[in-house]
Amino acid sequence: EQLSSERVLFSVATDYHQQLETYGSLIRQIHQARVSAPPLMGWWSWTAYYFGLNEGAALTNAQWEAEHLKSLGYNIFHIDEGYQYARGEYITPNATLFPRGLAPLEYKVRGLGLTPAIWTAPFEISERSWVYQNHPDWLVKNAKGQPIHAGTVVDNKDQLFVLDTTNPEAQGYLRKTYSTLVNDWGIHSIKMDFMDDSLIEGYYHEPNTTALEAQRIGLKIIRDAVGDNVYLDKDGSAMLNPVGYVDYGRISQDTGHTFDASKEAAPGIAARYYMNRNFFVADPDAFTVSTQTIDDQSWHESNKPATLDDAKVSIALAAVSGGMFEIGDALPTLSKAPERLALIQNQDLINMIRLGKASIPLDLMNFAPEDEQPSIFFLKEDDRQSILTVFNWTDKERERSINLTTTGLPASGEYAISDVLDNQKIAAVASGVLAFHQPPHSVRVFKIVDAHVSATAPAVRTEHPSAGNAGSTLTFVAHSQGGDAVLSYHWDFGDGITIEGSDVKHTYTEPGEFKVQVTAAGLSGLSAEDHFQLRISGYMPTTFEPQKIKRFEPEK
């Protein structure tokens, strides 16, 4: 007798963290996960304006981000739902809010040095959309041949249906939509929402197609349409199905402007920590730190201003994910709140994101009964420095103590501990136990430095050509080889051009000998350099040669 199944992993061990991380690593290898994308930092519009963002408010927030936050690494400018005419019609703007369309606005956003990003729900089709009005035959159907109803947008408004991704004409429409977003609007990062709601079984154009198969077919069409250099962020969907097509993936439910919203999002971030850099780069949803209220939204009583502790909980929760780091506030509201703006500017939190590693929920399976969910997260940033993040999910003040050996730190260490959010040094740890007071609805983020371990500069190795031709695009790659953890790489190409990144491209326009230098900035403040000589030969041709001219054709 034989049993046929998909690939199965069976493993027994006492260390459940190791088991989860092993599973994540195997998923990365088997499914060729896209995990090399940078941890995006920036702003998104949803929790700031919900359906109400208009052209003027968008530009104001873009200008504010560019002026106050871009230098810190916040460069993503994400417009969420509301810009489009209807779900399923994403290249037709909502003329009430964006009377000149989105392309002129995104042009200005790029001019500010920001990266345009946008929201879509790729497989949902509204009854108001062009597809529903003109091609109901492109939709997933029931046994009677009728389009299957799949819900509403909100409050029973706008009935929704599902695009049949196996229908060749629907595929063409999907391809055109995403190609336009990228090639005409200049979008570089695309969120794909509600893929769980549109995951319905039904009658597809291609018989015997399952909902999961249809979703993979649609994702491949989108990836092929946008190319490899555009970031795709899966939102609501099964965790595993989009792996290999998406760069980022939501690991929690929606957040908002309240402590309760953060508390409800936290279990997902804890339980899925091992997915970061294994399935995709984690998307913990946006954090909010302002006192902004949303009077016409009832989401978790968001009409009440968040306390400073609420704000700290929200941003710390995003930081422990080690993934995306997006601000969900109306940015101008931070101009008169320096203590809240300081949270966004906090270098230790930013470094947690730049390192790209998720904090481990130490109490994932044995959290305190009063917390009702994991509350202790630990990030070993390098051999010398670690971050311990502790949430108080309860309504009561607490006196807490944590034995540092439970984090994996050696008992022999001599630890200097500081409070990251309050910029205060903590008194010496007694017998390896960190004791502290914690108010209700709060978080403490401790930086732990082992004085027995000396700070060392990072070691860096480069992959690069030794020669090239003027006008040709060359690739340069930097790798960390031990020492201090690397936060950033800075390239100087010797021709007046500098670029940030571990994997970069550059084109020289003139021949000559150039000294190329890369500087790796380490976590402890030390840096390392590598340099090499590069010979560029020849000149860029300037003659008219029509036989060499090729007609540009957008990807289909």
Residue ranges and their predicted role:
Residues 414-433:
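Solvent-exposed beta-strand/loop surfaces of large extracellular or lumenal domains
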Residues 314, 318-321, 326, 367-410, ...:
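Carbohydrate-binding surface patches
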Residues 429-456:
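C-terminal beta-strand-rich structural cap/linker in extracellular carbohydrate-active enzymes
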Residues 450-556:
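Extracellular/lumenal mature domains of secreted and surface-exposed proteins
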Residues 39-179, 185-205:
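Aromatic-lined carbohydrate-binding/catalytic grooves of carbohydrate-active enzymes
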Residues 1-37, 305, 433, 438:
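Beta-strand-rich recognition/accessory modules
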Residues 103-106, 110, 114-117, 206-264, ...:
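Active-site-proximal helices and loops of the catalytic beta/alpha 8
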Residues 133-172, 217-334:
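Glycan-recognition surfaces
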